[in-house]
C-alpha cells in the first residue's frame, strides 16, 4: 500500500490485453475504450469518415500508438458500407465493383515495400514522400486496380485442386527441357 502495485494487486483488475499491453486508442462517449488493440490503425481517412458521420469517437491524445480494437474497426467499416449500399440503392453513380471493397491498411507495410510497389506500377509522385504519404498514394492506386474476380478465383481453385503452384510449373518445364 505504498503506491506501487504488486503482482498480486494486478490480478484483481481486468486481464492485460495481448501484445505489449496496448489497448484501443479511441474514446467513445467521453470514455476510453478498454478493448485490446488489433492491427488496424487509426488513419486520417478513418478520422474523416468518423467526423462526416458525426460518430462519438475520438482519439486519445495520451496514447503513443494509433491502433484500434477489432470492435471499432468493424463498427467503422459497417457504417461506411451502409452508406455505400444506400447510394447504390438510390440509383447513385456508384459502380458495382466498389460496393464491398475491403479495407487494406498499407501503412503496416515497410517503406521499401511501398517504394517497390510504386516503382513496379510506375506511379508518379513528388520526391521525398514520407511513409504516410507514400502509403496513401499507393492505397489510392491499389483501390483502382481492376481485378477479374471470377477468373482469379477460378484459376486459384484449379491450382489448389491440381496441387500445383507456379513454382511447380517452372520446375516441370525445366525438367522437360533437359
UniProtKB/Swiss-Prot annotation:
How does the record comment on the protein's domains?
A: The zinc-finger domain mediates direct interaction with DNA and phosphoinositol phosphates (phosphoinositol 3-phosphate, phosphoinositol 4-phosphate and phosphoinositol 5-phosphate). In vitro oxydation causes reversible disulfide bond formation between Cys residues in the zinc-finger domain and reversible loss of zinc ion binding.
Provide one Gene Ontology cellular component.
nucleolus
What is an annotated GO biological process for this record, any one? Answer: heart looping
- A Pfam cross-reference name: SAP30_Sin3_bdg
**Entry protein name:** Histone deacetylase complex subunit SAP30L
Check the record and name the InterPro entries matching this protein: His_deAcase_SAP30/SAP30L, SAP30_C_sf, SAP30_Sin3-bd, SAP30_zn-finger
Q: Which gene encodes it?
A: sap30l
Tissue spec. comment: Detected in embryos at 2dpf (at protein level). Widely expressed during embryogenesis and in adults.
Give the primary localization class: nucleus
Q: Which stretches does the entry tag as region Disordered?
A: 80-99
Traced from the root, the source organism's taxonomic lineage reads: Eukaryota, Metazoa, Chordata, Craniata, Vertebrata
Amino acid at each position: 500500500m505504498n503506491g506501487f502495485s504488486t503482482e498480486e494487486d494486478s490480478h484483481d483488475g481486468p486481464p492485460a490485453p495481448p501484445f505489449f499491453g496496448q489497448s484501443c486508442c479511441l474514446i467513445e462517449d467521453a470514455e476510453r475504450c478498454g478493448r485490446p488493440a488489433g492491427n488496424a490503425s487509426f488513419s486520417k481517412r478513418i478520422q474523416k469518415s468518423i467526423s462526416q458521420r458525426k460518430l462519438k469517437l475520438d482519439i486519445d491524445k495520451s496514447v503513443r500508438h494509433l491502433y484500434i480494437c477489432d470492435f471499432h474497426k468493424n463498427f467503422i467499416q459497417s457504417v461506411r458500407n451502409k452508406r455505400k449500399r444506400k447510394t447504390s440503392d438510390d440509383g447513385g453513380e456508384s459502380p458495382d465493383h466498389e460496393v464491398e471493397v475491403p479495407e487494406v491498411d498499407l501503412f503496416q507495410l515497410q517503406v521499401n515495400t511501398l517504394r517497390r510497389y510504386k516503382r513496379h506500377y510506375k506511379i508518379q509522385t513528388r520526391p521525398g514522400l514520407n511513409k504516410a504519404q507514400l502509403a496513401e498514394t499507393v492505397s489510392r492506386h491499389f483501390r483502382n486496380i481492376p481485378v477479374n474476380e471470377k477468373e482469379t478465383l477460378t484459376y486459384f481453385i484449379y491450382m489448389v485442386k491440381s496441387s500445383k503452384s507456379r513454382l511447380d510449373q517452372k520446375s516441370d518445364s525445366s525438367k522437360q527441357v533437359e
